[in-house]
Swiss-Prot record:
Gene3D superfamilies: DD-peptidase/beta-lactamase superfamily. The gene is glsA. It comes from Clostridium botulinum (strain 657 / Type Ba4). The keyword Hydrolase applies. InterPro entries: Beta-lactam/transpept-like (IPR012338), Glutaminase (IPR015868). SUPFAM superfamilies: beta-lactamase/transpeptidase-like. This is Glutaminase.
Amino acid sequence: MNRLFKTIIENNRKWVSEGKVASYIPELSKMDKNLLGISVCTLGGEEYWEGDAEVKFTIQSISKIVTLMLAIIDNGEDYVFSKVGMEPTETAFNSIVNLEAKESHKPINPMINAGAIVVASMVAGKDSDEKFDRILKFTRKISGNNNIDINLNVYKSEKETGHRNRALAYFMKSTGALKGNVEEILDVYFKQCSIEITCKDLARIGVMLANDGVSPYTGDRIVPRHVARIVKTIMVTCGMYDASGNFAVHIGIPAKSGVGGGIVACAPRRMGIGVLGTALDEKGNSIAGTKILEELSKQLDLSIF
């Protein structure tokens, strides 16, 4: 299996030159553009990895599936989806267009920034510190890694330059789509995006989802089955931003990307996959990481369609 991964990485390294690291968050622009790694966890508890699978990077938008799971567990799916939609979008992940165009002003799905900010507001906790503490502990739980922590430099960079996210949040506050203290909610959001993980962590999160919310290592149920199902479905329809349809056709498995270069994916009842490729395409997805998943999906016949 490791030989296969090594071959797939080398086959797709050429795509790195066509992408760029995220530059709108200054701290992310310091990332090495050439990082490329993959990790896979099977339902039998076997782990394989190749390349830069142990390099730490920030989770960014992959945290949106973490907070979505937690918000549904805390509030129930009916309440969560009364505040945020579940439809795909053709606009960019940080766009304000749909918030203005829709009569309800409700964010169109939980995987775009506006939707994720609303979801963060629904995580239970008496204040922003308690909310984030629960998110961090939940991330550690679903990945089986108690050493996961926040990258404070990225957090500060996000907080200082997150003007678009502030605009989205204050617009939603003005329409009633977002309840609570905007700056406290944004603080939770900036912190959740700054959690530092590796490909190995993502693969373990992926395999938990592939196993319908049960850890293949301990046999313990970590996430209710219906929550895992909802999140996997949203990952298919919305997880790769406005490239989700293309990803579904060519790769065909639930996945969620982040501008840190990571992608978490799962092949239901087979495996979890974590990929890192810091060079991004124009949609904000890892360009080589996507190509690696495409080749892996074809080689192992992973598509659910």
